[in-house]
Amino acid sequence: MKGSTLLLIIVAFVGLIVAVGASLLHNGLSARARPSALEELLARNAWHLAIPSDARAMRNPMPASEENLKDGRLHFADHCALCHANDGSGDALFGRGLYPKPPDLRQPETQNRSDGELFWIIENGVRFTGMPSFASEGMSPDSWKLVLFIRHLPQLTAEERIEMSRYNPKSPEDREEEKEEDEFLNGTAPQKSGMPNSHP
């Protein structure tokens, strides 16, 4: 019985590899098509296998103070929101084009991970996904503050999202447009050539 169970597991595993290989040969490696449920399952489970057990056991040394939470929130807005969106949904400009798509950080799939797992993913990234490494020397306080903020995402308020939008990266065009708006509102906008300064 034991030998037949092992044989069945091996056959199933080989069958799985053949199925994934056949799918890749048929569809190629394009990131345009939505991945199959099997591909998504394998990609998600790769995260768990990638994290060492001692890292999973780490606890966040940063107290959950308002200051630390705000630091994490603003850091997330500036560095993470392009892919994860300010609300952690993953519905962001770059996030929509990634494979696998960024997970919704508000959902149990992420919230049930240990602090150590989240920290490890932030610091080391995950191969074969769009998640890069943000490695730092030692135990980065910024990464631990991000863990605090990720825990807060399910309770994120509208006011916090508005504050975050001010810290999102901007293109040179966006910056120029903001500058022109500020100059106009402050009455310091340069006069366009050929336009009279005052009415006769």
Kindly give the residue locations of the regions a language model identified:
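Periplasmic c-type cytochrome electron-transfer domains
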Residues: K2-R73, R113, A135-I150, R166-P200
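A short linear-motif detector with a strong N-terminal bias
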Residues: E40-L42, L82-A85, T110-Q111
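Short hydrophobic/aromatic-rich motifs at helix boundaries and adjacent loops
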Residues: P52, S89-D91, F119
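Residue-level detector of conserved, well-ordered beta-strand and adjacent loop positions
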Residues: P63, R106, P132
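Periplasmic/extracellular electron-transfer cofactor-ligation site
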Residues: E67, R73-P100, V126-S133, P154-E159
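Short microdomains enriched in Cys/His and/or Lys/Arg
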Residues: K101-N112
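Soluble extracytoplasmic domains of inner/organellar membrane proteins
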Residues: N112-R161
